[in-house]
């Protein structure tokens, strides 16, 4: 795909960004994931909401999240501490976040209007640990590819079983880990546990083995009854 950026403005665009991405979206590269993503980003900046929403749906990333934190990350040990939200998904109690007091699962207004979630408000607490969960309804048992992105160290769990632990800290907002997992028929829980830095963001996308996005998966940002698994399963 042709190189897109020149002199970068504060919003991440250059002088010809909009012209280039509009041309690319109509070219043979139009179905490329990166082109769809940047077309969505450009349309959102221009407040072209209909087109932005259309491209958001084409990407098919998880955009229904519920959050819990910020938990203590003393000397960088928090990622290996099993805080209670790791296995307790209901929003009917508060959890002890140690030096950060008591916290609970909560939702963010308008978070489903974006592909990537940035922990902008949570960063006010400084370094710490954040949880994000989503519930995925699948019409059948299926093997899928799960693409995950995070700009900090993280762990991922599917139905309470750890499936990914990042090995390096580097930014790739449209996915830097790809793992093959099995979704069960009915409800599934995906949990991301991330270390907070000044720009922590998360991203998740399910696709088939040919990298086609699913159109029949449903996502929920409130608790849904699911069946926890074990490592043996």
Which positions does each model-derived feature cover?
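Beta-strand-rich ligand-recognition modules
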Residues: 158-206
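Accessory carbohydrate-binding/adhesion or oligomerization-edge regions at the termini
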Residues: 15-111, 194-233
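Extracellular and analogous surface-interaction loops
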Residues: 132-144, 180-187
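Aromatic-lined ligand-binding clefts that engage carbohydrates, nucleic acids, or primary amines
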Residues: 138, 143-156, 190
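TPR repeat positional signature
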Residues: 1-5, 36
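Extracellular beta-rich ligand/substrate-recognition surface
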Residues: 119-130, 167-171
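Acidic, Ser/Thr/Pro-rich low-complexity intrinsically disordered segments
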Residues: 130, 150-158, 163
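Residue at a conserved register position within TPR or TPR-like alpha-solenoid repeats
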Residues: 5-9, 43-45
């Amino acid at each position: 795909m042709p190189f897109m950026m020149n002199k970068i403005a504060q919003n991440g665009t250059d002088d010809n960004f909009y012209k280039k991405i509009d041309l690319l979206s109509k070219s043979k590269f139009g179905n490329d994931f990166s082109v769809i993503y940047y077309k969505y980003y450009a349309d959102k900046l221009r407040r072209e909401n209909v087109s932005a929403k259309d491209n958001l749906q084409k990407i098919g990333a998880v955009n229904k999240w519920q959050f819990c934190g910020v938990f203590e990350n003393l000397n960088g040990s928090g990622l290996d501490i099993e805080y209670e939200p790791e296995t307790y998904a209901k929003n009917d109690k508060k959890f002890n976040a140690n030096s950060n007091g008591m916290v609970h699962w909560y939702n963010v207004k308008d978070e489903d209007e974006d592909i990537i979630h940035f922990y902008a408000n949570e960063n006010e607490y400084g370094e710490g640990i954040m949880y994000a969960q989503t519930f995925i309804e699948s019409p059948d048992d299926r093997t899928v590819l799960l693409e995950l992105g995070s700009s900090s160290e993280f762990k991922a769990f599917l139905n309470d079983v750890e499936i990914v632990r990042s090995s390096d800290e580097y930014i790739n907002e449209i996915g830097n880990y790809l793992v093959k997992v099995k979704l069960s028929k009915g409800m599934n829980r995906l949990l991301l546990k991330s270390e907070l830095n000044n720009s922590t963001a998360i991203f998740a996308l399910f696709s088939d083995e040919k990298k086609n996005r699913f159109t029949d998966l449903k996502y929920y940002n409130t608790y849904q009854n699911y069946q926890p698994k074990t490592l043996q399963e």
